[in-house]
Structure formats: structure tokens, C-alpha cells
């Protein structure tokens, strides 16, 4: 009976991706709670109710439409200040995120790349937030800050429309940061901090960790070498690989990396045995050819 062995480095890379996704979901949930902070204020005093609530009054019951006025006022009050649990946007959004997480796990088990899955998921989450959490229209300050204690009027605590707009955009910003900056805005600073790029590099290296690549030997022969012979931690290999020109951009785009060039680069910097066995002049030409071929695709 055959057994399937999973490389520990691949597991670590996958766990790092899942932790990054969980942190993004937590950040989005916190922003949703901030956006709904104005729904959790203190009870509004009767003397400071909105103008449309003035229709609720006591009389002798002779008015034929007294019941209708009361029902209209009561219904509008419930619409403004109460929300059913089934209609709570945060409750529905939590269920949506749970389904998204299950879908991500299924896609990763089927062999799809995490960077591709996450970029698609981010777009779906942004669309969901934009549709289900639109910015509320601006209201007058009298409708939001009519709370008093004794004779003193409390200070305005409800965020302005511009503040609410910036808060609602935090979810989009968090999701965009987690998936990496757009290709047109790619810069060296982003390359150093983009965890999704490191995860993609680690994933591709882990897949070919034991594969042997051909290098020119000093003895006019062929030198076979692989990542295992480096005797290095996968995280250290990834950090060194990011210094190879063009590798971070390829990883960001989800393209295939020139792994032979990456291996040669890392081995020249960290393996004395490799330095003694390889023909450095021919190696430089091979590495440059690999880079040109992969970056031009």
C-alpha cells in the first residue's frame, strides 16, 4: 500500500497563508463593528426625538385616524433603531466569511495555488462589502446627537459622513494589502513586506525541493544539485531568493519561477562546496538566460 508524504515546508507555507487570511477576516469584522458603533448609543430623551416622531401624541381618542398615526410612528421608530438578528449585516457577513473559508480549503486541497485563490476571494469580499454595507446618507447633526443629561447637552459623538466613509474603506484596504498591491503600483518596498509573495516562492521551491538541476562543472562535465543539498531552512532560502532580480514580480503575478536560477543564486551565496564544483562563468550565462526566458513570458 503506497503512502503519500507531505513536505513539512509545504505545510508551514500553507499554515502561514491561512493565518494571514484569518487576520484579514478579523480586521474586516473589527471595521464592521466600528461602522455600527452609532447603533449602540444611549436611549434618546423624549424631548429630543426627531421631528417626524411628533405625530405620536395623546388625545381623547376622538380622532378617527389615531390608531394609524400611532402605528406609523411606532413602525418608523422600529425601522430606525431596531434590527432583526436575521437581518443583521454583521451576522450575515460572518456566515458569508465562514463559507468563503470552507471554499478556500476545498480549492487548496484540489491543488490550486493560494495566490490565485486569494486574489479572487478578495475581489468577492470587496464586492460583498460594497453591496451590503453602503455608506449611509448624511444626516443632520440634530438627528444624531440629541442626548442630554439634566440641562447640559452632550458633545457630538457620532462620526461625520467623511469619517464613516474612511472606516468603511478600511475593509477594502485590508483585503487589498493582504492580496498584494496592483501590478502597476509594484515597488521595492512592497516586495519586502508582501507575505503573499513569500508564500508563493516557498510553495514553488517546496514542490521541487528534491529535484536535481543541471549546472556546468569545473571538470567539463555536468553538476547535479538540488535545494536539499543546501542544508538550509526554507524560510532562509526564500529570503535569499527574493534578491534574485525579477523573482518577486513573477511570484506576485503567480507565474512560474526560474528555480534553477534561484538555486544557483542561493548556492553561490551559501555553499562553499557548490562554489568549488561549479564553473562560475558558464553559470552566470545560464542564470541570465533563465531569467530572460521566464520574465519575457
UniProtKB/Swiss-Prot annotation:
Domain of life: Viruses
Keyword presence, Chaperone: yes
Keyword presence, Phosphoprotein: yes
Bias (Polar residues): 158-170
SUPFAM superfamilies attached to this UniProt entry: Phosphoprotein M1, C-terminal domain (SSF118173)
Motif extent (Nuclear export signal): 49-58
Molecular function GO labels: RNA-directed RNA polymerase activity
Residue ranges of the region described as Disordered: 132-175
UniProt keyword annotations, A-Z: Chaperone, Cytoplasmic inwards viral transport, Host cytoplasm, Host nucleus, Host-virus interaction, Inhibition of host innate immune response by virus, Inhibition of host interferon signaling pathway by virus, Inhibition of host STAT1 by virus, Inhibition of host STAT2 by virus, Inhibition of host TBK1 by virus, Inhibition of host TLR pathway by virus, Interferon antiviral system evasion, Microtubular inwards viral transport, Phosphoprotein, Viral immunoevasion, Viral RNA replication, Virion, Virus entry into host cell
Effect of residue 179 to P: Abolished inhibitory properties on host TBK1 and interferon induction
Post-translational modification, as annotated: Phosphorylated by host PKC and by an unknown kinase.
Stretches with biased composition (Basic and acidic residues): 140-157
Gene3D superfamilies membership: 6.10.140.1560, Phosphoprotein, C-terminal domain (1.20.120.820)
Residues bearing PTM Phosphoserine: 63, 162, 210, 271
Any GO BP annotation: symbiont-mediated suppression of host cytoplasmic pattern recognition receptor signaling pathway via inhibition of TBK1 activity
GO cellular component terms, A-Z: host cell; host cell cytoplasm; host cell nucleus; virion component
DYNLL1 and DYNLL2 binding: region residues: 138-172
Consequence of changing residue 177 to T: In strain: Isolate SAD Bern, Isolate SAD Bern original var 1, Isolate SAD Bern original var 2, Isolate SAD Bern original var 3, Isolate SAD Bern original var 4 and Isolate SAD Bern original var 5
Intervals of motif Nuclear localization signal: 211-214
Function: Non catalytic polymerase cofactor and regulatory protein that plays a role in viral transcription and replication. Stabilizes the RNA polymerase L to the N-RNA template and binds the soluble protein N, preventing it from encapsidating non-genomic RNA. Also inhibits host IFN-alpha and IFN-beta signaling by binding and retaining phosphorylated STAT1 in the cytoplasm or by inhibiting the DNA binding of STAT1 in the nucleus. Might be involved, through interaction with host dynein, in intracellular microtubule-dependent virus transport of incoming virus from the synapse toward the cell body.
Family: Belongs to the lyssavirus protein P family.
Protein name: Phosphoprotein
